[in-house]
Amino acid sequence: MKTQVCIIGGGPSGLMLSQLLHLQGIETVVLERQSREYVLSRIRAGVLENGFTELMRQAQCGERMDKEGEVHDGFFIAHAGKLDRVDLHKYSNGSSVMVYGQTELTRDLYEARDRMNGIIIHNAEDVQPHDVKSANPYVTYRKNNTEYRVDCDYVIGADGFHGVSRKSIPADVLKEYEKVYPFGWLGVLSRTKPVSPELIYAKHDRGFALCSLRSQVLSRYYIHCLLYTSDAADE
């Protein structure tokens, strides 16, 4: 198989890139390790910044988002027994955020690629980029016990931190920048009405909490927690 750009990873990043390149006349092949059903079952973030909503429209994928998403012009900060509202619309020259789940925008991107006959190969196992520093890179993968090869001009890694792409970057050109925090987040998805029409970011002596939402019948809550339970006190 021959294409201009081979994209490893069929999540939102890979699909969005494939869509944008297609609109510029550039051919792509997307390789995804999981099934489409699995990708669409993953629960991820649900608040889209203004720049990304504009990108969805530019990619011709924003119609359902604009119809079903919830525009939020602000958010609340809970601290010291008070609840203060920050007016995003006022302090960002009219910008806002959109509450629209990543699962839904991924579905929209899939449908856009399907309409334009984009090539997305699911259940691609043992994906491996080759000759990535050369002018003729290629990617191999296995599906149904058969090995395939995709020759291309460019290989794009959109498969996340744990994906094969990052591990395939030659050590002499790889640069990594990270900030590791000594805590984690516990997230809960609840089929209940949100406690607030807009997000609440809460500061407390025992840590941070977030009251978020996916819709008016689906809530998402996060609490700041220790990375390891062995570090927790009995109380």
Describe the function of each predicted region.
Residues 22-42:
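Glycine-rich FAD pyrophosphate-binding loop
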Residues 4-29:
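N-terminal Rossmann-like FAD-binding beta1-loop-alpha1 element of flavoenzymes
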Residues 146-153:
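Core beta-strand elements of the Rossmann-like FAD/NAD(P) dinucleotide-binding domain
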Residues 49-112:
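Active-site-adjacent segment of FAD-dependent monooxygenases/related oxidoreductases
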Residues 228-235:
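Conserved small/polar residues in nucleotide/adenosyl-binding loops
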Residues 186, 199-227:
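Active-site substrate-recognition segment that forms the wall
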Residues 157-171:
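Flavin (primarily FAD) binding-site architecture
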Residues 122-135:
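A conserved short coil-to-beta-strand element within the FAD-binding core of flavoproteins
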